[in-house]
């Protein structure tokens, strides 16, 4: 039953769907609010970024619907092909990609720009989950099983850093370490994994004046609030001015071309300004519920001899948690600017589409787990409230 291409939507996790819909709704409202000024200046009307986000939502919803129909066994069988596709796309973006803000990260398509790094996150999770299932005993006992991962992930990291995209590289490294930990790899293997990655990133950071300026900026943005510290200082002023209840939806001052990237990397600052700490608590609570539900799905899907499905869900949860932590940390001045979006909320077509695809994977795995545990499609049909 679990490998069927059929699906009864009444067997889906209703709470998980509602949480995602709530985040998407907040995202659409905030994309419209935070982008009106920059959209008016760049394109002559206020709706440009909102319309593109709605289009991405439609495409992402289609992706999620298609993924819901695909048995997880199919993703396991073709995990290597999906990872290879990601590497090819990362290579193509270096040749044919569109450069924005000094980084070449987007492939220009007919109707939109696509960021291959977003797909690479999903492909990495699928590939690593399959690898850890196939070599689960070796990973716990033999360090070479972990070292072998350096070749494919080293190639991927190299392609990402050439764009350059340090944020995605750090995020995927975190997903790699987290999934290894969940798979039962000994602590000493994390030293083998983390130290080389940290050393390489440190060398690249030191040799990049632009990146070093970002590090110095987040350490003390007020030292040069009109120079390298301008973006972060404006973000902090936005967050601080929101108070408890905020200035009201649409009433942000910083989004009026004072805060660069107000609709993308720094949307959290605009959200805090307009909704206050009350809104921030609600938003973070929704993310907390999302992660809690995904960890519950992963725990239920765990099979000692076949942990692929559980590891995929854990990987998606770690990915979302990492993006949330880094994005909020950047807005608060805890981390240097990384260029990672708030899942489902920040403007970004590729990010939204791939986030919905990832949720489709989680929902499919949860659906299969319910079937395996004795709830047939007929039982689900007889009890429409099941899974809500």
UniProtKB/Swiss-Prot annotation:
Taxonomic classification: Bacteria, Pseudomonadati, Pseudomonadota, Gammaproteobacteria, Thiotrichales
Molecular-function GO terms, alphabetical: lipid-linked peptidoglycan transporter activity; peptidoglycan glycosyltransferase activity
Membrane topology: Multi-pass membrane protein
Protein task: Peptidoglycan polymerase that is essential for cell division.
Catalysis: reaction(s): [GlcNAc-(1->4)-Mur2Ac(oyl-L-Ala-gamma-D-Glu-L-Lys-D-Ala-D-Ala)](n)-di-trans,octa-cis-undecaprenyl diphosphate + beta-D-GlcNAc-(1->4)-Mur2Ac(oyl-L-Ala-gamma-D-Glu-L-Lys-D-Ala-D-Ala)-di-trans,octa-cis-undecaprenyl diphosphate = [GlcNAc-(1->4)-Mur2Ac(oyl-L-Ala-gamma-D-Glu-L-Lys-D-Ala-D-Ala)](n+1)-di-trans,octa-cis-undecaprenyl diphosphate + di-trans,octa-cis-undecaprenyl diphosphate + H(+)
Biological-process GO terms, alphabetical: cell wall organization; FtsZ-dependent cytokinesis; peptidoglycan biosynthetic process; regulation of cell shape
Protein name, as recorded: Probable peptidoglycan glycosyltransferase FtsW
Key words, A-Z: Cell cycle, Cell division, Cell inner membrane, Cell membrane, Cell shape, Cell wall biogenesis/degradation, Glycosyltransferase, Membrane, Peptidoglycan synthesis, Transferase, Transmembrane, Transmembrane helix
Cellular localization per UniProt: Cell inner membrane
The family this protein is said to belong to: Belongs to the SEDS family. FtsW subfamily.
Sequence intervals crossing the membrane: 16-36, 54-74, 82-102, 109-129, 144-164, 167-187, 189-209, 233-253, 277-297, 310-330, 342-362
PROSITE patterns from the UniProt entry: FTSW_RODA_SPOVE (PS00428)
Protein EC: 2.4.99.28
InterPro entries: Cell_cycle_FtsW-rel_CS, FtsW, FtsW/RodA
Pathway: Cell wall biogenesis; peptidoglycan biosynthesis
GO cellular component terms given for this protein: cell division site; plasma membrane
Coiled-coil features, chain-numbered ranges: none
């Amino acid at each position: 039953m679990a490998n069927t291409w059929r699906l009864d939507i009444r067997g889906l996790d209703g709470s998980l769907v509602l949480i995602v819909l709530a985040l998407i709704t907040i995202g659409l409202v905030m994309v419209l609010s935070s982008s009106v000024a920059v959209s008016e200046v760049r394109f002559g009307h206020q709706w440009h970024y909102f319309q593109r986000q709605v289009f991405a939502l439609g495409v992402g919803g289609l992706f999620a619907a298609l993924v819901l129909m695909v048995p997880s066994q199919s993703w396991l069988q073709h995990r290597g092909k999906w990872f290879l596709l990601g590497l090819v796309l990362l290579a193509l973006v270096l040749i044919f990609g569109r450069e924005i803000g000094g980084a070449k990260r987007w492939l220009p398509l007919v109707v939109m720009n696509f960021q291959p790094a977003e797909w690479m996150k999903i492909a990495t999770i699928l590939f690593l989950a399959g690898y850890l299932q196939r070599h689960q005993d070796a990973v716990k006992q033999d360090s070479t099983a972990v070292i072998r991962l350096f070749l494919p992930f080293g190639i991927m990291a190299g392609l990402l850093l050439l764009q350059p995209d340090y944020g995605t590289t750090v995020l995927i490294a975190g997903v790699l370490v987290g999934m290894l930990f969940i798979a039962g790899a000994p602590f000493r293997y994390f030293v083998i994994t983390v130290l080389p990655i940290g050393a390489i990133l440190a060398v690249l950071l030191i040799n990049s004046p632009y990146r070093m300026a970002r590090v110095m900026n987040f350490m003390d943005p007020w030292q040069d609030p009109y120079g390298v510290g301008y973006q972060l200082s404006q973000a902090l002023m936005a967050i601080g001015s929101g108070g408890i209840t905020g200035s009201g939806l649409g009433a942000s001052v910083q989004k009026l071309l004072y805060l660069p990237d107000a609709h993308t990397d720094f949307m959290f600052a605009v959200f805090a300004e307009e909704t206050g700490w009350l809104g921030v608590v609600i938003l973070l609570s929704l993310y907390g519920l999302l992660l809690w539900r995904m960890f519950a799905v992963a725990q239920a899907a765990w099979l000692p001899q076949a942990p692929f499905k559980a590891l995929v869900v854990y990987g998606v949860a770690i990915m979302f948690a990492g993006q949330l932590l880094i994005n909020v940390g950047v807005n608060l001045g805890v981390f240097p600017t990384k260029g990672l979006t708030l899942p489902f909320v920040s403007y970004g077509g590729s990010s939204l589409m791939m986030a919905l695809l990832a949720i489709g994977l989680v929902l499919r795995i949860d659906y299969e787990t319910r079937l395996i545990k004795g709830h047939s499609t007929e039982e689900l049909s007889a009890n429409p409230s099941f899974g809500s």
